[in-house]
């Protein structure tokens, strides 16, 4: 950090990123040099054949060339190990070394070509020597090809626009010019991100919704990354440091922060009842994912169980529309929910941007009409997730501030129109008019379910919603408070999605910058220690030491790079640890739905939960407990529906077996 400037443009790699690539190349080159030297010493007496003098010269020059490359790579590696992320001064000679290293590729290419030509001419020498030359040529071209691929990966399309301003500084541009430059860079960045997203989603149909989602997602990414000059390894190092810092804070505060109390019997009974409901309705939320999740959960027997359903002809007992392998999907739904064919009213696997698959079924056990909305499982769903602007939710309620996540709001509106306009709910309640309406979903489906329940509440006042691992950035604070009477959310452990919002991502970015600015260890040590800590654990107190107090001014400065300099010129920018997060009108603070049940793992079950059965406690939690993203190896796995289902199985069975335990689930630990 910042990205290096070479050949007049910025690259998405920093001068301290070359330790590990350099070490890998150094090992390959040294082994290669030893092999060539051994080959030459053992067979130099057998090179008196036709063309042998050329091969002898080839091997000698190759060894000299390899020795020069080894020395250059060693120097690059040593220089890259100097300094810290925020102190690139000791690495100022890196650009010259890289120019030398790149220049050495030309004689390597020439020599590899000559070796290939000589071998192709049919040199009549010892076969071992010829095979050694062939191996040398192959290795040379593999390294050259790998270098070309690496250059493509670290190429920054905006590098040519940003590099000229790295030496100009703010003193060379007035506020008007700097504002124009910033707007120009942001426009270019949005265009680049939109091109990337279109390439990634090249197989998605291009309708109006998709084009809007492309633009919305591109603007989100360009806005988020516009005020820093972070390279990917900086983010990885920051996340590693932040994880250790969070664990250290939790360990130090735990004795003072644990508050044990005996809640009222009504509160505990309510928690037990809602946990049982969550345990029951999670089956429907999982069923909405269809056969992929079912096979994933049952890798050995799943395919055999639903194989017959895949080949079975459809019946007329239910509507089954959209998507492929519909009978496979429906077979997995039957096995997951335990319902019969006649219990399903409508099953849709139609999947487009802002249009989510869903199912409607009659649940006779709970006497409810269940609407289950599928979560993220396709690129179309990802684009729906990333359409993070806010729009006013069109609902009939007394709440004034009705802002909601645009993508999820439109997805919920689509399901609402299908349920009402196509008469799906009317059909369901004509069969079971005494049943109540329950809407469920996981992840994106959980957010859509919460919005859908709010839209339907005017027509169905008794509606209930169970949102499993819903995104935090769903709707306004007023709607969050309004929804607590009919929506329950369930969150497992450090799951990142219920903590994910644009505001929280901005907070995470600032915390990463802050912890990186404090650290006085080189990046390669941070990454090595972080990898060890993630895999095997350790003592989080062994954090890299911090900068002296006199260097605290680093925290009030944007980290290096032209875009950071541009934001520094803006009077609206503040990097102070005490400054509030900026709230853009397009991305205001948004909150999770309803009341929240938090499942937390008790004891240790291995770093990834695979060493022994985990046990969980459950408690009601305030939404503020999910106002920061927590880093850890389970922040992604805790979001998986199969992991959540196992956690629910565990906590429900444990609470049922411990009805006489008054302290069940009453501990609360707040982690800053």
From Swiss-Prot:
Cofactor dependence: Ca(2+)
Membrane topology: Multi-pass membrane protein
MF terms (GO), sorted A to Z: lipase activity; metal ion binding; monoacylglycerol lipase activity; triacylglycerol lipase activity
Extracellular-facing ranges: 39-58, 124-132
Record's catalysed reaction(s): a 1,2-diacyl-sn-glycerol + H2O = a 2-acylglycerol + a fatty acid + H(+); 1-octadecanoyl-2-(5Z,8Z,11Z,14Z-eicosatetraenoyl)-sn-glycerol + H2O = 2-(5Z,8Z,11Z,14Z-eicosatetraenoyl)-glycerol + octadecanoate + H(+); 1,2-di-(9Z-octadecenoyl)-sn-glycerol + H2O = 2-(9Z-octadecenoyl)-glycerol + (9Z)-octadecenoate + H(+); 1-(9Z-octadecenoyl)-2-(5Z,8Z,11Z,14Z-eicosatetraenoyl)-sn-glycerol + H2O = 2-(5Z,8Z,11Z,14Z-eicosatetraenoyl)-glycerol + (9Z)-octadecenoate + H(+)
pH relationship of activity: Optimum pH is 7.0.
Regulation of catalytic or functional activity: Inhibited by the 1,2,3-triazole urea covalent inhibitors KT109 and KT172. Inhibited by p-hydroxy-mercuri-benzoate and HgCl(2), but not by PMSF. Also inhibited by RHC80267, a drug that blocks 2-AG formation.
Keywords: Calcium, Cell membrane, Hydrolase, Lipid degradation, Lipid metabolism, Membrane, Metal-binding, Phosphoprotein, Transmembrane, Transmembrane helix
CDD domains for the chain: Lipase_3
Sites bearing Phosphoserine, chain numbering: 570, 574, 579, 583-584
GO cellular component terms attached to this protein's record: lysosomal membrane; nucleoplasm; plasma membrane
Subcellular localization, as worded in the UniProt entry: Cell membrane
Primary location group: membrane
Residue ranges, Cytoplasmic side: 1-17, 80-102, 154-672
Superkingdom of source: Eukaryota
Transmembrane segments: 18-38, 59-79, 103-123, 133-153
Enzyme class: hydrolase
UniProt-listed Enzyme Commission number(s): 3.1.1.116, 3.1.1.3
One GO term of the biological process aspect: neuroblast proliferation
Annotated InterPro entries: AB_hydrolase_fold, DAG_Lipase-Related, Fungal_lipase-type
Function: Lipase that catalyzes the hydrolysis of arachidonic acid (AA)-esterified diacylglycerols (DAGs) to produce the principal endocannabinoid, 2-arachidonoylglycerol (2-AG) which can be further cleaved by downstream enzymes to release arachidonic acid (AA) for cyclooxygenase (COX)-mediated eicosanoid production. Preferentially hydrolyzes DAGs at the sn-1 position in a calcium-dependent manner and has negligible activity against other lipids including monoacylglycerols and phospholipids.
Family: Belongs to the AB hydrolase superfamily. Lipase family.
Official protein name in the record: Diacylglycerol lipase-beta
């Amino acid at each position: 950090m910042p990205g290096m400037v070479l050949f007049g443009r910025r690259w998405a790699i920093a001068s301290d990123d070359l330790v590990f690539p350099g070490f890998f190349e150094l090992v390959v080159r040294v082994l290669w040099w030893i092999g060539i030297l051994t080959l030459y010493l053992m067979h130099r007496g057998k090179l008196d054949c036709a063309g042998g003098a050329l091969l002898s010269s080839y091997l000698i020059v190759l060894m000299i060339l390899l020795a020069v490359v080894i020395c250059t790579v060693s120097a690059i590696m040593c220089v890259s190990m100097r300094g810290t992320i925020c102190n690139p001064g000791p690495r100022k000679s890196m650009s010259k070394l890289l120019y030398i290293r790149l220049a050495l590729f030309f004689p390597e290419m020439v020599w590899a070509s000559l070796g290939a030509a000589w071998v192709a001419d049919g040199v009549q020498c010892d076969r071992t020597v010829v095979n050694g030359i062939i191996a040398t040529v192959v290795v040379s071209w593999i390294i050259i090809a790998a270098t070309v691929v690496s250059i493509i990966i670290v190429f920054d399309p905006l590098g040519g626009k940003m590099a000229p301003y790295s030496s100009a500084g703010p003193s060379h541009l007035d506020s008007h010019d700097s504002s124009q430059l910033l707007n120009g860079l942001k426009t270019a960045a949005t265009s680049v991100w939109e091109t990337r997203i279109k390439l990634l989603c090249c197989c998605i149909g291009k309708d109006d919704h998709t084009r809007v989602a492309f633009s919305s997602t591109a603007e989100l990414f360009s806005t988020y990354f516009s005020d820093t000059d972070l390279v990917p390894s900086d983010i990885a190092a920051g996340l590693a440091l932040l994880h250790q810092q969070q664990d250290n804070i939790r360990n130090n505060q735990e004795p003072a922060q644990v508050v044990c109390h005996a809640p009222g019997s009504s509160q505990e009974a309510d928690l037990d009842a809602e946990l049982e409901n969550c345990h029951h309705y999670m089956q429907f939320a999982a069923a909405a994912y269809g056969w992929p999740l079912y096979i994933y959960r049952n890798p050995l027997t799943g395919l055999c169980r639903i194989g017959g359903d895949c080949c079975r002809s459809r019946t007329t007992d239910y509507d089954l529309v959209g998507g492929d392998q519909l009978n496979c999907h429906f077979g997995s739904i039957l096995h997951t929910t335990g319902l019969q064919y006649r219990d399903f009213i409508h099953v849709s696997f139609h999947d487009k941007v802002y249009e989510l698959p869903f199912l409607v079924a009659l649940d006779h056990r709970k006497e409810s009409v269940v609407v289950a909305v599928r979560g993220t499982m396709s690129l179309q769903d990802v684009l729906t997730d990333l359409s993070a602007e806010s729009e006013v939710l069109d609902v009939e309620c007394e709440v004034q501030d009705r802002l909601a996540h645009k993508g999820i709001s439109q997805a919920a509106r689509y399901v609402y129109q299908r349920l009402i306009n196509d008469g799906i709910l009317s059909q369901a309640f004509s069969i079971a008019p005494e049943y109540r309406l329950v809407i469920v979903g996981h992840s994106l489906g959980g957010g859509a379910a919460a919005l859908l329940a709010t839209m339907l509440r005017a027509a169905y006042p008794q509606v209930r919603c169970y949102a499993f691992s819903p995104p935090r950035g769903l709707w306004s604070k007023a709607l969050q408070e309004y929804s607590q009477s009919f929506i329950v959310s369930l969150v497992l452990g450090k799951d990142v999605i219920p903590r994910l919002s644009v505001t929280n991502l901005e907070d995470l970015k600032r915390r990463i910058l802050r912890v990186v600015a404090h650290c006085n260890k080189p990046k390669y040590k941070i990454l090595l220690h972080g990898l060890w800590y993630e895999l095997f654990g350790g003592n989080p107190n062994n954090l890299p030491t911090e900068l002296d107090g006199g260097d605290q001014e680093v925290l009030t400065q944007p980290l290096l790079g032209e875009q950071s300099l541009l934001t520094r010129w803006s009077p609206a920018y503040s990097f102070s640890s005490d400054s509030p997060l900026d709230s853009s009108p397009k991305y205001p603070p948004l909150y999770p739905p309803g009341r929240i049940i938090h499942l937390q793992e008790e004891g240790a079950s291995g770093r990834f939960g695979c060493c022994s059965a985990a046990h969980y406690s459950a408690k009601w939690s305030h939404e503020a407990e999910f106002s920061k993203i927590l880093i850890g190896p389970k922040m992604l796995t805790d979001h998986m529906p199969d992991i959540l289902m196992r956690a629910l199985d565990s906590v429900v069975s444990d609470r049922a077996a411990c009805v006489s335990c008054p302290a069940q689930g009453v501990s609360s630990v707040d982690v800053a």
